[in-house]
């Protein structure tokens, strides 16, 4: 199904989920990705089936929430949701297949990990290749509770990952800018060159790359960060 055209400001609510449940769907999943525009690290995706009996107040696009509020809501989502999952696709894969396809891959993986399996998908912006009815919503994380919940989980998980990587690569300020395009990040790339976990197909990273991406080195670095 094609994305629904955007129409100005939206109010984030559970109207769509209620309408779908009224039509007989019982496992409506929201799906969203985070980190698509970053220069460093994986793109993350979340998938969430919210509980009708245990609603969560205050859900909204993760970008509109401060970090403390996101953490609180992420805890409530993990506690109250019928099912939730998070997936990540690393920088080497992003460089191999492009960020659009990598984002879709992360979302597909997140959906495939849900138990129970969803019977309807509400996806932010892009439809996915699933034999399940779905609806793609422009600015879905601003207008749909389930998509907002997926966005929050993915954002919190990715931010935590950036804090871990900041200990491995302290020169780059990852805990601050989370791998996105900032003057601080640009200066670090210019001074030190990109790490193996930067997206080498992205500008300005490509212009300062001093080595080909070494996938085995990436895996070693993931092990190092996991032990940090």
UniProtKB/Swiss-Prot annotation:
Binding site for a divalent metal cation: 32-33, 124
InterPro entries referenced in this protein's UniProt entry, alphabetically: RNase_HII, RNase_HII/HIII, RNase_HII/HIII_dom, RNaseH-like_sf, RNaseH_sf
Obligatory cofactor(s): Mn(2+); Mg(2+)
CC cofactor note: Manganese or magnesium. Binds 1 divalent metal ion per monomer in the absence of substrate. May bind a second metal ion after substrate binding.
Highest taxon in the source lineage: Bacteria
Gene Ontology CC annotations of this record: cytoplasm; ribonuclease H2 complex
Metal-binding found in the keyword field: yes
Keywords from the UniProt entry: Cytoplasm, Endonuclease, Hydrolase, Manganese, Metal-binding, Nuclease
SUPFAM superfamilies in the cross-refs: Ribonuclease H-like
GO molecular function, one term: RNA-DNA hybrid ribonuclease activity
Enzyme class: hydrolase
Reactions listed under catalytic activity: Endonucleolytic cleavage to 5'-phosphomonoester
Domain RNase H type-2: 26-214
Record-level GO BP terms: DNA replication, removal of RNA primer; mismatch repair
Principal location listed in the UniProt entry: cytoplasm
Cell compartment(s), UniProt: Cytoplasm
EC number: 3.1.26.4
Protein's job: Endonuclease that specifically degrades the RNA of RNA-DNA hybrids.
NCBIfam families: PRK00015.1-1, PRK00015.1-3
Protein family: Belongs to the RNase HII family.
Protein name: Ribonuclease HII
Source species of the chain: Solibacter usitatus (strain Ellin6076)
Gene that produces this protein: rnhB
């Amino acid at each position: 199904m094609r994305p629904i055209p955007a129409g100005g400001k939206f109010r984030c609510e559970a109207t769509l989920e209620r309408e779908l449940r009224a039509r007989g769907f019982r496992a409506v999943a929201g799906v969203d990705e985070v980190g698509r525009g970053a220069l460093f690290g994986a793109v993350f995706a979340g998938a969430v089936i919210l509980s009708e009996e245990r609603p969560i107040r205050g859900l909204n696009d993760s970008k509109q929430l401060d970090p403390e509020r996101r953490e609180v809501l992420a805890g409530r989502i993990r506690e109250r949701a019928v099912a939730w999952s998070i997936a990540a696709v690393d920088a080497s894969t992003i460089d191999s297949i492009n960020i659009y396809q990598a984002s879709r891959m992360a979302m597909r993986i997140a959906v495939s990990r849900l138990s129970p399996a969803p019977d309807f998908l509400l996806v932010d912006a892009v439809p996915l290749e699933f034999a399940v009815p779905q609806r793609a919503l422009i600015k879905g994380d601003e207008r749909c509770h389930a998509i907002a919940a997926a966005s929050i989980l993915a954002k919190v998980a990715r931010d935590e990952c950036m804090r871990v990587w900041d200990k491995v690569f302290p020169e780059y300020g990852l805990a601050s800018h989370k791998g996105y395009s900032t003057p601080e990040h640009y200066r670090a790339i210019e001074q030190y060159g990109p790490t193996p976990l930067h997206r080498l197909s992205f500008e300005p990273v490509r212009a300062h790359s001093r080595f080909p991406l070494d996938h085995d080195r990436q895996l070693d670095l993931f092990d190092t960060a996991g032990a940090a």
